[in-house]
Amino acid sequence: MKRAFIMVLDSFGIGATEDADRFGDVGSDTLGHIAEACAKGEADNGRKGPLNLPNLTRLGLVKAYEGSTGKIAAGMDGNADVIGAYAWAHELSSGKDTPSGHWEIAGVPVLFDWGYFSDHENSFPQELLDKLVKRANLPGYLGNCHSSGTVILDQFGEEHMKTGKPIFYTSADSVFQIACHEETFGLDKLYELCEIAREELTEGGYNIGRVIARPFIGDKAGNFQRTGNRHDLAVEPPAPTVLQKLVDEKQGHVVSVGKIADIYANCGITKKVKATGLDALFDATLKEMKEAGDKTIVFTNFVDFDSSWGHRRDIAGYAAGLELFDRRLPELMELVGEDDILILTADHGCDPSWTGTDHTREHIPVLIYGPKVKPGSLGHRETFADIGQTLATYFGTSPMDYGKNML
């Protein structure tokens, strides 16, 4: 029985790439800077001392980090016995966004440039805004700017509740985000508005990667909170991913846990499981792994590393999240059968010590574990697509156009 379990620690970069200067990210280092802060006692917020990730270390994380940066992460064990295969991978795609990283992991790098709304104020074309107001019968809109998701709620949340005007905003990513109150505006109405925005952006040729519904609750600035009902409307990958090939060519199964299905615009996904928060995502993943049959991929995105701690530049929160993940990792490893492979990786960096609130261009770890996987270094990989090609070889699908098999 062949099964693959892919766990994306969203934004868990392990050191700046050679082309980081193109992105203003030279010196960014998600793992390294978290470890450094922990070793100095600067991340003792409910957790304490050096970053403690013994299970990820056994799978090769510290060795992969050393390969990427030439050093051992502060306070971590560079001499631990390694029981998995490990690599550090460079991104071939032109961006450092979530769809690019995930599609490339599945064998389809994004070699075109996404469209962006680069103006920080009055970010969206008036023609687009007018169409949205007319088609969705809106009383107007708020925002129309670059912002972080929490700041914009404090800024416009109360006015939104009074007026019913949705909050439109963007970031350095290729996104059109819409924040609305779950109770006063309504979740279904928000999702419908996002569908309209997706259609208008596609028809208008804006080449925007994702429309994101950002529902929230609360009654005044300071206590607004985003809920777990986020929904991403992505464009479809430009070519069949290894997920699609497994389903089409081998009649296999691909189980999405968390936001994976949204990222791939449901292409190559046969089952969707929603969960919010690290523990809930972990529990859902374990359940799906126990039930998975032959020719199945269980694919989970642990979004909190990015959305709750990376973008919010919360070093202590990120460290605590990693330690929680690490404590639970043996539960996953116990479910890896004789012919299975477990792959732990990331889709980009989001250094919580870095300036601004955006992603960082970094190498990602590729940690592969299974009874038949030979432990040791797989070296520097030139593209995340090596993961996709490895899966294509493993499941016996037609080869991907990019990437090399690592096993």
From Swiss-Prot:
GO terms for molecular function: magnesium ion binding; manganese ion binding; phosphopentomutase activity. Its main location: cytoplasm. Mn(2+) 1 binds at residues 10, 347-348. Pfam families: Metalloenzyme. Binds 2 manganese ions. It is an enzyme of class 5 (isomerase). Its cofactor is Mn(2+). One of its GO terms (biological process) is 2-deoxyribose 1-phosphate catabolic process. Its EC number is 5.4.2.7. Keywords: Cytoplasm, Isomerase, Manganese, Metal-binding. Signal peptide: none annotated. Mn(2+) 2 binds at residues 306, 311, 359. One of its GO terms (cellular component) is cytosol. It catalyses: 2-deoxy-alpha-D-ribose 1-phosphate = 2-deoxy-D-ribose 5-phosphate; alpha-D-ribose 1-phosphate = D-ribose 5-phosphate. Pathway: Carbohydrate degradation; 2-deoxy-D-ribose 1-phosphate degradation; D-glyceraldehyde 3-phosphate and acetaldehyde from 2-deoxy-alpha-D-ribose 1-phosphate: step 1/2. It is found in: Cytoplasm. NCBIfam families: deoB (TIGR01696), PRK05362.1 (NF003766). Belongs to the phosphopentomutase family. Isomerase that catalyzes the conversion of deoxy-ribose 1-phosphate (dRib-1-P) and ribose 1-phosphate (Rib-1-P) to deoxy-ribose 5-phosphate (dRib-5-P) and ribose 5-phosphate (Rib-5-P), respectively. PANTHER family: PHOSPHOPENTOMUTASE. This is Phosphopentomutase. The gene is deoB.
